[in-house]
């Protein structure tokens, strides 16, 4: 039987996208809460099938839902950079984008690898 390789990713945005667009009513924010609730179900499904994945997670989500994000890592999955609060970089100045990258990286406790991004080198992160 042929072997297939698949890259499975999730955008674990929770309510960050709503906040980035200024949608901070209880209704908008409640829609963003489902991602954190669903993460437990997704992790159980992935574990039952022995599947590993990458979760693109904004820093806001890591700070707001640390337990859920820790569960992702403990289950053997990767958390990847996904900005601070899902603000499109095209709408940011260079300085705003740099500040967003730095702010998004800190909650994870990670540092960006040398040479990976010019912004990281300039900022010393």
Regions found by a protein language model. Give the residues of each.
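Catalytic alpha-helical scaffold of carbohydrate-active enzymes acting on polysaccharides/glycoconjugates
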Residues: 1-118, 122-125
């Amino acid at each position: 039987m042929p072997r297939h390789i698949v890259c499975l990713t999730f955008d674990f945005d929770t309510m960050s996208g709503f906040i980035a667009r200024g949608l901070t009513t209880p209704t908008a924010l409640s829609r963003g809460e489902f991602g954190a609730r669903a993460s437990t179900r997704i992790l159980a499904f992935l574990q039952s099938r022995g599947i590993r994945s990458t979760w693109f997670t904004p820093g806001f989500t890591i700070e707001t839902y640390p337990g859920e994000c820790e569960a992702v890592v403990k289950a053997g999955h990767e958390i990847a950079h996904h900005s601070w609060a899902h603000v499109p970089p095209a709408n940011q100045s260079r300085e705003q984008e740099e500040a967003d990258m730095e702010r998004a990286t800190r909650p994870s406790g990670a540092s960006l690898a040398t040479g990976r991004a010019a912004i990281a080198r300039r900022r010393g992160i």
